[in-house]
Amino acid sequence: MTLQPAILSEPDTPAPAEALTRVSPMMEQYHEIKAANPGLLLFYRMGDFYELFFEDAEIAARALGITLTKRGKHKGQDIPMCGVPVERSDDYLHRLIALGHRVAVCEQTEDPAAARARKSVVRRDVVRLITPGTLTEDTLLDARTNNYLLAIARVRGSTGGDRLGLAWIDISTAEFIVTECALGELAATLARINPNEAIVTDALYSDPELGPLLRELAAVTPLTRDVFDSATAERRLCDYFAVATMDGLAAMSRLEATAAAACITYVERTQLGQKPPLSPPSREIAGATMAIDPATRANLELTRTLAGERRGSLLDAIDCTVTAAGSRLLAQRLAAPLTDAGAIAHRLDAVEAFVADPILRDGLRATLRAAPDLARALARLSVGRGGPRDLAALRDGLLAADAALAQLAAATSLPQEILAAMAALRRPSRQLADEFSRALADELPLQKRDGGFVRANYQAALDETRALRDASRQVVAAMQARYADAAGVKGLKIRHNNVLGYFVEVTAQHGERLMAAPMNATFIHRQTLAGQVRFTTAELGEIEAKIANAGERALGLELEIFEKLTAMVIAATDDLRAAAQAFATLDVTLALAKLAIDDNYVRPEVDGSLSFAIEGGRHPVVEQALKRDGQPFIANACDLSPGPAQSSGQIWLITGPNMAGKSTFLRQNALIALLAQIGAFVPAARARIGIVDRLFSRVGAADDLARGRSTFMVEMVETAVILNQASERALVILDEIGRGTATFDGLSIAWAAIEHLHESNRCRALFATHYHELTALSGKLPRVFNATVRVKEWHGEVVFLHEVMPGSADRSYGIQVAKLAGLPPSVIARAKTVLAKLEANDRGQSARALADDLPLFALTARAPAEALPPTEAEQLIAALQALHPDELTPREALDALYALKAKLPK
């Protein structure tokens, strides 16, 4: 969703005077804090609840489905209010952030008792600004997905060619990337990055061309122009990364620097002045990754299905990773396949090494399975939101690094990518792991404020303080026995309440003894009740103070230790970050090796040619689904390589019936190319693929009512993108172009599109169609090759063989598919009659003449069986269904078998 334009103002912004008149002190404070944080939902701490007021309450109540009530009045009007319990606030925050809202968390910063003593409202301050793109908490993040904040800056071209600078950050993993693109490339780039929040200028947000595209993102935050000030961008970047000049950072354009500076400015504001330690910006080189437009990503279901689910996507099918960081890296690679054959070969070498060594592969996967998410633990500690378990995660990660290095050291001839990962794993000092092992207890609380996370015997002062805290009962019990003996009062008790603290209590008859000399020198009278008299002593007061402070002092000492350990972590940030990346790289490589072994994938040959030769290709997702059902996948070859037209062609024109597997064949070849270029083995018997620089898919379509576009219009827009942008190195798959309009219109469009692909784009393409007339183009265009999907007719039934072979189909078998779908028999019978008449007249008869010639279609009272007699196959199936094998004698079974054989056609 899109949020209101907002500036994350500094906390000293004054509130409007009119908002502060005639309100209670609490509401006055609320208005001041709210005015300093416009555009954010204010979670205002009130005891054990966070409360929201006015419009914030109405928004939150709708979004969370909680009760909207009221609290007092403001200017004579009821104040809308809703609230959520503090202890469950993370759940509510997660839901609000997922909907694109931003939240300011306002906490009580003093004890209410201190406020009462001052006769004033409790002091409160905003301690966190939570936005969709600046999350670090595990409870708010998806462990397997990056959480990107994206900044977009624009410069107007003198001839109308606008350029855009993009910078995106994941502060939960410290990634920071910049690039520059043309306006026409923005949609594909946004689809690849998939940001959780985008920041832009007010002007860009309101731009008639860019605005609609931006508003399709999950959350957009318009900011004032000063955040995107190019004149101060380099200084802001240098200040953030503590370098004297931009020479200390990666080379980047002024436009990229502007976007990068906007990112870090927004991060600093949302983190209330803290500077999360980010990796220096890395510059993404234009053309280094395969360009994939949004429609193609959606159609191929790379990371999400068309229904928005991860399950059933390509990512779900190939994700064998055992760590969250590995899963994130695999998704990144799938979103941005490489176009450098050398870099792809390095990745494939690493996968092949693990394919060839099952013992090393399985052992390393077991080691990585125990490795925590180092990157996100490091990020939380860096911004002050970490806990003891994050320190333990780093300890366990370093121990896992040692184990992994020991396993890898036993291997020989490791490829470059694995050697680089080993070097990164060696970087962190092992003193960190040793220190954390000595310092951290076995059982750790979630929050550092809970205490109890430092191991006994780590610090003497802490042990002494804990002993006093934990031994308080024994100390008081010993004092009680000593006082009872000294006073000669066996019933003397030491008790405690919140008013008097610790006190000595005796019955009324013994009270006079303690108030008389010499006992009154020790026991000081405090209170007389009906049946008891209460006293205190100087010693008891001292012990009470020690006991009361012991818990606080113990926690304070633990927090000091926590800060010391955290400082050690921050000092080693770069080394720990490198180790975290190495874990992710190893995990992805191992996962792809396991996938190759489990599903019989092969190493593709990827080079700089224009080849595309697949033998025994399979669809990775469909194959897995069929395997679960115990069914085989029919493999098919595809050769789009340049060569003689009679053997193949760079444009395959595929005809065949519905349900035969044309769309699956199209998609599987696109996915094989994509898998090859992320450095994965592929589902085929053999594959040689020349680098694909752009991947286009126009498969299936739905209307876009929000933009006022029909299904056919969506289809034409997607086709236009392909015809205008596909290069010689592109791979294009097109399914049934022109089907959404009149037959001859659609045929004409499809015909012209094929000619354009052949003559102008000159790319590799798969074109599936039901316009059989198009097959004539293979005789006219030398690089067009006809292919068809085999079917077999058997006694009036159609059997889909799912085999792609040279040739063309003369029928689409639509009526047979309609019958399989369950259309009423009377409709099927009527359709056959109409089809026969159409075919007899070769479609040359006018619609009016055809309607006059055919008898009127009318439903009768005839039974469906009379309308369409069962086929021989249906009769055989019915006979088999009527048999009950467990109830037949051997003789009856034999007779039944002969009877069935007799029903078979001669």
UniProtKB/Swiss-Prot annotation:
Gene3D superfamilies for the chain: 1.10.1420.10, 6.10.140.430, DNA repair protein MutS, domain I, MutS, connector domain, P-loop containing nucleotide triphosphate hydrolases
Domain of life: Bacteria
One GO CC term, this protein: cytosol
Binding site for ATP: 656-663
Matching CDD domains: ABC_MutS1
Keywords recorded for this protein, A-Z: ATP-binding, DNA damage, DNA repair, DNA-binding, Nucleotide-binding
Protein's job: This protein is involved in the repair of mismatches in DNA. It is possible that it carries out the mismatch recognition step. This protein has a weak ATPase activity.
Name of the featured protein: DNA mismatch repair protein MutS
The species this protein was found in: Rhodopseudomonas palustris (strain BisA53)
The organism's taxonomic lineage, starting at the top: Bacteria, Pseudomonadati, Pseudomonadota, Alphaproteobacteria, Hyphomicrobiales
Gene assigned in the entry: mutS
